[in-house]
Regions:
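Iron-associated oxidoreductase/ferritin-like identity signal
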Residues: 1-188
Length: 188
């Protein structure tokens, strides 16, 4: 197969854009930042989805912080430490989501108005150490399923957002395992 001098053969045999065409496309709509003409996802749907994920992470931060301060009992110290660590990690997730929203030309919705309605997970206070662990585990399981669905929706249409969501998903799975172990330890 012959290629023009400006075409770059890819490993799969597909041909990447010729350099002048690539340069021309990059100059179009430069105010869109990272979102180029090759962005294949429905940007408005992705922004809506990421704002729901942001709300979920923020609700999780608030729940974990409440549980950290309210946990008491003989087993409370290691559980509190886990709650505090998870709250910090969920805030990192929220920050990553907010940053990606801006990169996509959206606005991260940090408004407390409707936060619970936008969140996939619920804010449940819990009144015992056991119930707090269970509620956090349920919320992590909801987040895991939500992120899996988002990742599948994005497919190859937005690899950057998909990669970020896969990293957050891995963290949520670790949180769920941590909480399941804590729950087992308290029962044990």
């Amino acid at each position: 197969m012959k290629h023009s001098a400006n075409e770059i053969p890819a490993r799969s045999g597909a041909v990447l854009s010729d350099i002048p065409a690539l340069r021309k496309r990059a100059r179009q709509n430069i105010e869109e930042g990272a979102v180029t003409t090759g962005y294949a996802a429905d940007r408005e749907a992705v922004i809506r989805m990421l704002n729901e994920a942001l709300a979920t992470e923020l609700v999780c931060v608030l729940r974990y912080k409440r549980h950290y301060f309210m946990a008491k009992g003989i087993h409370a110290d290691p559980v509190k430490a886990e709650f505090l660590a998870h709250a910090g990690e969920e805030m990192v997730h929220a920050d990553r989501l907010a940053k990606r929203l801006v990169e996509l030309g959206g606005e991260p919705n940090f408004s407390p108005d409707g936060l619970s309605a936008r969140s996939h997970a619920e804010y449940v206070e819990g009144d015992t150490l056991n119930s707090m662990i269970k509620e956090n585990l349920i919320a992590e399981r909801i987040a895991i399923e939500s992120y899996r669905e988002m990742i599948a929706y994005l497919a190859e249409h937005d690899p950057t957002t998909q990669r970020m969501l896969k990293e957050i998903l891995a963290s949520e799975e670790e949180h769920a395992e941590d909480l399941a172990s804590l729950l087992e330890g308290i029962k044990g």
